[in-house]
Amino acid sequence: YTVKRSTYSFWRISESTQIASGEVIADANGEFTIPVRLEESDAYKNNDKVYYRYSVEATATNVAGETQSSTDVISAGNRSLVLQMELQEKTCKDKPFNIVFKAQNLNGRPVEVKGNYALYSANEKDFKVSGETPVATGTFTSNEEMTLDWKNIPSGAYVLKASVKDNQGKEVTADANAVLFSREDKRPPVQSTVWFYAPNTEFDATHPAVFCFGTSEKDAYVMMNVFCGDKLLESKALNLSDTIMRFTYPYQESYG
């Protein structure tokens, strides 16, 4: 038999590592027991945000030399739930937007739980929470789409924190970093050598193409080329100084 361990987390899945192997002898009924110790990875000791899947493969050979194999998978972790959420790194706050707080058990099956979320101001360099009081709070039901309206929150760096309780009463948390901004911002909301946002890159006779470009640098010169497919629409030099410019390109038949 062999026992292999894979480590799962929000950001990666590790390759399986063999942690045990050996031989056992079946009893008179043809049954045998495999000793399996669910060892943690030394790299993630006591890390609540990772869990493991242990693959136990047994290969049995009878006296006639016939061989059969079977594999079982055991999931284990310090928590019985995994909580995730997707929040765009750059989130436009001008309009309400939808979000889903996803909760799954360690086998990847959805689990319905109630939870809480809180949005905190953060340091724009490392996204560490910069204040104890959240700027927005609320509740959610896992795996259900809900709408957030943050238009009155100042542009800047934030951390969204969410938490639920698993079936053992243990807290399970998830964090997501985001920069909130408005299309009306006159300067980048965080220090940015290049700030780019394209609310509409496809256009027709009624809807122009629109994008915003800016920089936090002072007295910066930028060469800008705008293409529609392979066709160059415009080429110009920009002199920007801690500002954002909005560009609008109405559709023309000559663009093709």
Predicted regions and their residues:
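A structural signal for beta-strand and strand-to-loop patches characteristic of beta-rich domains
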Residues: 1-256
